[in-house]
Amino acid sequence: MNPSTAQATAVVDELVRGGVREVVLCPGSRNAPLAFALQAADLEGRLRLHMRIDERTAGFLALGLAVAGKRPVPIVMTSGTAVANLGPAVLEANYARVPLVVLSANRPYEMLGTGANQTIEQLGLFGSQVRATISLGLAEDDAGQNSQWRSAVCRVLAAARGTRSGNAGPVHFDIPLREPLVPDVHAQGPVPQGRPGGAAWTTTQHATLDVPMDLDLTPDTIVISGHGSALRPELAGLPTVAEPTAPLHGIPVHPMALPQLKPRQAVITGRPTLHRSVSKVLADPSVAVYALTTGPRWPDVSGNVLATGTRAVVSGEPDRAWINRCRTLSEHTDKAVRAQLAAHPKATGLHVAAAVMDALTDGDQLLLGASNPVRDAALVSYPAPKIRVLSNRGVAGIDGTVSAAVGAALAYEEGRTVALLGDLTFLHDASGLLIGSGEPRPRDLTIVVANDDGGGIFELLEQGDPQYAGVFERVFGTPHGMDLAALCAAYRVEHHLVGLGELSTRLSAPEAPGDRGIRVLEVTTERSGLRELHAAVRAQL
């Protein structure tokens, strides 16, 4: 067995021993030893391999697999620009704390700076965006290297999981490989062996960070539950503004009701980023703000946080009048939103979000586009407790959302996955629908596209003010006029153009026997009236 083949075999074996079950691979020559080893492990049923031809979408596929599967997922590619294409996925994984492993093949280091083909200084390419950058030395005919290879894999997985730091995230694992890059026809020599019984070479215990924080519940308190939050039993029963991807600790409070409530105290869990009404409360110097997190960072955009911890030690009792006021105002806001939706003459993204949220049932998995869809979902309904909700809210870009949805659906076998996206988000990553014949495909993924022919979110921002109407449509609205049906046909994906009523019917229909695969349900919406619709809701409050 030649050195590069031996090294790749040991690395893949140790990844499996370390708990890796899904791997995404992009074709290339320099990463051929890893490709051969991964294919062998896939055929043996030790892991599931996903082939993709585009490293950018492959990175987000791995991200979706990691988020939904709650395990590290390696994305393997050749050297050069192939590695650089992982930049957007690495950024998202960093800020969302997702255990993504970028496993890049490299040229031997002596080739750097020589003008050799497809050779760049890729070690350290991701800088501070990764938890660790780990490289292996060139493989030699030395049996003693086996322990170094396996030990390095264990370090990679520990860093990705945040085992010792409490801060999961992406890791760059760079492996320089020297020719020959294919297995010997007549392999000689032993296969590098791991620990007996399939154990990992190095085991690590997950470190726990326990920082108690005193919290008096007597002042009128609102909980702000943001993306990445853990469920906080000690906050049960408190009024909570929860983003769709975050747990609801207590009584749900509609985000549009918050300006009327005037809390005296706010407790942040996770990282809230969706609502301006929340940002205003957290920036109010008259509000005492506390932050509970599960890692070393805490959110504090305004610099207003008084104290942080990993758990609250509560004292005092919340005022029942405050609790009742929060409940009443929230229920009134919910009704106002639904009333305005019913009165609005045309379908908008809010209408589509309402139809989707109403059709979900226990066991469903929902993935929301990071632009308007996640905000629309937050305004029309809070997901039921037994619905899993995901969104790329680490950096909140629209990149790779189709691929992330495919990955999430592949990792979630317990039920169906529904993704709610805007048209620009869908078009930005339409190549995520490209799945090779024979590759694993989602069992049941429905992608709902609210198509308003452009960037609806800007209608609600300062740029959407009527005084900028002469500039808005071209540089912010960005109409495209794309035929989504033709696009889906090119990818051999089922497509239906539906109205709101048919959307609800199709989402609520009993599941047909067998695998449904991927389907796209497109709803034509309008964005020109979004500003007025939101204003009408606020007027009712």
Curated annotation (Swiss-Prot):
<dbReference type="InterPro" id="IPR029061">
    <property type="entry name" value="THDP-binding"/>
</dbReference>
<keyword id="KW-0786">Thiamine pyrophosphate</keyword>
<dbReference type="GO" id="GO:0030976">
    <property type="term" value="F:thiamine pyrophosphate binding"/>
</dbReference>
<keyword id="KW-0460">Magnesium</keyword>
<comment type="subunit">
    <text>Homodimer.</text>
</comment>
<dbReference type="Pfam" id="PF02775">
    <property type="entry name" value="TPP_enzyme_C"/>
</dbReference>
<dbReference type="GO" id="GO:0070204">
    <property type="term" value="F:2-succinyl-5-enolpyruvyl-6-hydroxy-3-cyclohexene-1-carboxylic-acid synthase activity"/>
</dbReference>
<protein>
    <recommendedName>
        <fullName>2-succinyl-5-enolpyruvyl-6-hydroxy-3-cyclohexene-1-carboxylate synthase</fullName>
        <ecNumber>2.2.1.9</ecNumber>
    </recommendedName>
</protein>
<keyword id="KW-0464">Manganese</keyword>
<dbReference type="InterPro" id="IPR011766">
    <property type="entry name" value="TPP_enzyme_TPP-bd"/>
</dbReference>
<keyword id="KW-0474">Menaquinone biosynthesis</keyword>
<comment type="pathway">
    <text>Quinol/quinone metabolism; menaquinone biosynthesis.</text>
</comment>
<dbReference type="InterPro" id="IPR004433">
    <property type="entry name" value="MenaQ_synth_MenD"/>
</dbReference>
<dbReference type="GO" id="GO:0030145">
    <property type="term" value="F:manganese ion binding"/>
</dbReference>
<dbReference type="GO" id="GO:0009234">
    <property type="term" value="P:menaquinone biosynthetic process"/>
</dbReference>
<comment type="pathway">
    <text>Quinol/quinone metabolism; 1,4-dihydroxy-2-naphthoate biosynthesis; 1,4-dihydroxy-2-naphthoate from chorismate: step 2/7.</text>
</comment>
<keyword id="KW-0479">Metal-binding</keyword>
<dbReference type="GO" id="GO:0000287">
    <property type="term" value="F:magnesium ion binding"/>
</dbReference>
<comment type="function">
    <text>Catalyzes the thiamine diphosphate-dependent decarboxylation of 2-oxoglutarate and the subsequent addition of the resulting succinic semialdehyde-thiamine pyrophosphate anion to isochorismate to yield 2-succinyl-5-enolpyruvyl-6-hydroxy-3-cyclohexene-1-carboxylate (SEPHCHC).</text>
</comment>
<dbReference type="InterPro" id="IPR012001">
    <property type="entry name" value="Thiamin_PyroP_enz_TPP-bd_dom"/>
</dbReference>
<comment type="similarity">
    <text>Belongs to the TPP enzyme family. MenD subfamily.</text>
</comment>
<dbReference type="Pfam" id="PF02776">
    <property type="entry name" value="TPP_enzyme_N"/>
</dbReference>
<keyword id="KW-0808">Transferase</keyword>
